[in-house]
Curated annotation (Swiss-Prot):
EC numbers on record: 3.2.1.4
Molecular-function GO terms, alphabetical: cellulase activity
Source organism per UniProt: Phaseolus vulgaris
Protein name: Endoglucanase
Record key words, sorted: Carbohydrate metabolism, Cellulose degradation, Fruit ripening, Glycosidase, Hydrolase, Polysaccharide degradation, Signal
Purpose: Involved in ripening fruit process.
Origin organism lineage: Eukaryota, Viridiplantae, Streptophyta, Embryophyta, Tracheophyta
Length: 496
């Protein structure tokens, strides 16, 4: 993963983007008390999910709640005679990157599966299902044949050199695809994971749709496995650095959970030698996601998965303070800090794993795990995860929320095109490439559209945050930061 941080920096430099937008919701609620801050987790969850409506591409539905957005990119794929409308803009730009979009959909689906009752209890399950479906529908359209998958819409270089609203952008909508001749196992397998996870979400409420999702997932997994080749050879942005074995295990784990078919478990057992001990969970590295899912199977009696369970424990040991094998340090203020490029993506995903892993231990009446001479109970793991959520919501040295629209102090200059340029509804005149840069990107004013729920890249290793639109490493939100946070905030609505 040595090249990972370099890639992120180069990518974000070229993107010069930031998400933000005005939604019709109240400000985040934070009540003071003599003790620690008492955060309104239900409100934070609602806003974390609402963020995805501000990232939508395509024809917006009548139920759209983020009112500063309008229809956009309605001709995506038209020149190739394929309908690639819909899906999500990745971060602060107007490009649809399929791989991180699929990962975000996987995480949202995992949250819906793991915390269905908690999310439903605060009336957010329907909104979450809509967010999942928006991503899944795009992936279904992008899978046009058993061995053809569209993976990106938009010219990253051209888009990142401009600063335009998605509603009137005029940069090329170039499409990219993988097939048997130019494979991308990582992406095909991630699409498979996302669709199989989503199939579980919809199984009880739309059986036909769930079946369609699972069918495409199986086909995509076969494509990924039988036409192995790294996406690093077929991608312009979001290239793979960790290889494709993690995605194959991740997809097989979800397919086993969704279908119950023993062939997927056999595949995992036969290939569990691929499993590695890791210290991050990200759009590029899914090992601990698969390991966590399969740890549940181990405790359920699948003892052949012992190596994978041990590898999952190694991740916990790598991030827990006080662990003898700790690899990820915390800032002076207590935030897990993996690297200084959109660090909160790693914090939210690690926190998600910590919460779910602790829940698995409780469900299976396991006392805890050992990290050398250190022992951590499920309660201790959950307790540390909670500190990460609280840090993001405001319990930090900057005394600010890193979620836009939550609390009284939060980022106002999100690195996000649509948020930083007046809505087309109030400023219908076209904002061109250079005008966007000079008039809005370089502006010292707050973004005119408050992108409620957007979580930015976060502070530096010393807990400092510069609220500047140009600081893409810290001021830009992404779909996968929010997707992981949905599970983490949902966990705090649960008792264990």
């Amino acid at each position: 993963m040595g090249y990972h941080s370099v890639f992120i920096a180069v990518f974000l430099w070229s993107s010069m983007v930031c998400h933000n937008g005005l939604a019709m919701m109240d400000d985040g609620k934070l009540t003071s008390s003599s003790g620690p801050p008492n955060y309104d987790y239900a409100d934070a969850l609602a806003k974390a999910i609402l963020f995805f409506e501000g990232q939508r591409s395509g024809k917006l539905p009548s139920s759209q709640r983020v009112k500063w957005r309008e229809d956009s990119a309605l001709s995506d794929g038209k020149l190739q005679n394929v309908n690639l409308m819909g899906g999500y803009y990745d971060a602060g730009d107007n490009v649809k990157f399929g791989w991180p979009m699929a990962f975000s959909t996987s995480l949202l689906s995992w949250a819906a599966v793991e915390y269905e009752s908690e999310i439903s209890s605060v009336n957010q399950l329907g909104y979450l299902q809509s967010a999942i479906r928006w991503g899944a529908d795009f992936m279904l359209r992008a899978h046009t044949s058993p061995t053809t998958l569209y993976t990106q819409v938009g010219d990253g270089n051209a888009d990142h050199n401009c600063w335009e609203r998605p509603e009137d952008m005029d940069t090329p909508r170039t499409v990219y695809k993988i097939d048997a001749n130019s494979p991308g196992t990582e992406v095909a397998a991630e699409y498979a994971a996302a669709l199989s996870a989503a199939s579980i979400v919809f199984k009880k409420i739309d059986a036909k749709y769930s079946s369609t999702l699972l069918s495409h997932s199986k086909s995509l997994f076969d494509f990924a496995d039988k036409n192995r080749g790294s996406y690093s050879g077929s991608c312009p942005f979001y290239c793979s650095y960790s290889g494709y074995q993690d995605e194959l295990l991740w997809a097989a784990a979800w397919l086993y959970k969704a279908s119950g078919e023993s062939k997927y478990l056999s595949y995992i057992i036969s290939n569990q030698g691929w499993s590695q001990t890791v210290s991050e969970f990200s759009w590029d590295n899914k090992f601990v996601g698969a390991q966590t899912l399969l740890t549940e199977e181990f405790y359920g009696g699948k003892k052949d998965l012992a190596k994978i369970k041990t590898d999952a424990e190694s991740f916990i040991c790598a991030v827990m303070p006080g662990s003898n094998s700790r690899q990820i340090k915390t800032t002076p203020g207590g935030l897990l800090f993996t690297r200084d490029s959109s660090n909160l993506q790693y914090t939210t995903s690690s926190t998600m794993v910590l919460f779910i892993f602790s829940r698995i231990l409780n469900r299976n009446h396991i006392n805890g795990i050992n990290c050398g001479s250190s022992h951590f109970t499920a309660s201790q793991i959950r307790g540390f995860a909670k500190t990460q959520v609280e840090y993001i919501l405001g319990k930090n040295p900057m005394k600010m929320s890193y979620m836009v629209g939550f609390g009284s102090k939060y980022p106002k200059q999100l690195h996000h095109r649509g948020s930083s340029i007046p809505s087309i509804k109030v400023h219908p005149a076209k904002v061109g490439c250079n005008a966007g840069l000079s008039d809005y990107y370089n502006s010292a004013n707050p973004n005119p559209n408050t992108h409620v729920g957007a979580i930015v890249g976060g502070p530096d290793s010393n807990d400092r945050f510069n609220d500047a639109r140009s600081d893409y490493s810290h001021a830009e939100p992404t779909t996968y930061i929010n997707a992981a946070f949905v599970a983490s905030i949902s966990a705090l609505l649960a008792k264990t």
